[in-house]
């Protein structure tokens, strides 16, 4: 917005399908866009692509950010819509090879039709800060030496918060002073809070809600826990590594999101919560990667916003 961008609101397509179409068509006809760039977590909704094509938009881009989708209905919609995408777009983008193959197909990827654009970030912004660590811990009422396990993600099936609770329960058994910091919001939040209450760990968990300054909270954490059921290329995992945080993640996450095996442990979702907890303790002992080294690895892996942004020009 500071650079002159504008935000337009249209009805929620799930709640008002025809209202969404009417509003989107009106927007396209009034503004006369040269490019429409659609970020996609699945192919369940390809309506924006179709409407942009019908409106005569010169360049229509579909950008894949996921590698699977939950639910039978969404899977059926994905299967039906994926072959149709090619009729509406000029460009196919993906945040990772896995995400590109999933949405656009192996053949399109191997023919070189898919451009990989990493989920890049501002490296300086996400670097570790001792000042932020101290201030956020004070704000949350956490002692300086307590183990803080953190997670950033929407409360939905994909992020696997139930597994996070099971793992943290094991961590609590061995280190009662440990705290869990969950950043985000979503439809499953109340359900997870109720499960935490039943497990007897609710008072050890901090639910921050949506934060506009996630980078400050990352500095307050000791280990980043990310047992997702599936992912394209998770932005929050890249941010955690930019902060130098040791990470314990599921084996369903693409290796393209791992900057270095030195401070990332990948574990099968089939493994027990005990094994996950042991990995958390081990990574905590390994400690953070230095700020300068984390920034260097980020740039080498292609996650520097200044370099990746050029691909969109």
Question: Where are the model-predicted features located?
Answer:
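Aromatic "clamp/platform" in nucleotide-sugar-dependent glycosyltransferases that forms part
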Residues: 41, 210, 229
């Amino acid at each position: 917005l500071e650079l002159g961008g504008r935000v337009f609101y249209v009805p929620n397509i799930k709640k008002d399908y025809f209202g969404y179409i009417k509003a989107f068509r009106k927007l396209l006809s009034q503004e006369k866009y040269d490019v429409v760039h659609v970020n996609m977590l699945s192919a369940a909704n390809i309506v924006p692509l179709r409407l942009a094509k019908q409106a005569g938009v010169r360049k229509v881009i579909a950008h894949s950010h996921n590698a699977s989708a939950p639910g039978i209905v969404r899977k059926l919609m994905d299967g039906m819509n994926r072959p149709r995408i090619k009729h509406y777009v000029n460009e196919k983008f993906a945040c990772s090879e896995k995400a590109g193959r999933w949405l656009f197909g192996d053949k399109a990827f191997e023919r070189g039709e898919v451009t990989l654009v990493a989920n890049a970030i501002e490296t300086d912004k996400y670097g570790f800060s001792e000042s932020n660590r101290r201030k956020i811990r004070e704000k949350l009422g956490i002692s300086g030496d307590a183990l803080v396990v953190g997670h950033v993600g929407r409360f939905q099936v994909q992020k696997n918060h139930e597994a996070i609770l099971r793992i943290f329960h094991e961590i609590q058994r061995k280190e009662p002073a440990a705290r869990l910091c969950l950043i985000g919001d979503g439809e499953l939040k109340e359900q997870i809070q109720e499960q935490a209450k039943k497990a007897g760990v609710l008072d050890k968990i901090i639910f921050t809600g949506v934060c506009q300054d996630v980078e400050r909270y990352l500095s307050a954490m000791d280990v980043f826990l990310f047992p997702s059921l599936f992912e394209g290329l998770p932005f929050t995992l890249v941010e955690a590594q930019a902060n130098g945080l040791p990470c314990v993640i599921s084996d369903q996450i693409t290796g393209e999101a791992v900057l270095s095996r030195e401070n990332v442990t990948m574990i099968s979702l089939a493994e027990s919560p005990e094994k996950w907890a042991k990995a958390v303790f081990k990574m905590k002992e390994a400690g953070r990667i230095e700020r300068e080294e984390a920034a260097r690895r980020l740039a080498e892996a292609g996650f520097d916003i200044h370099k990746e942004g050029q691909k969109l020009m």
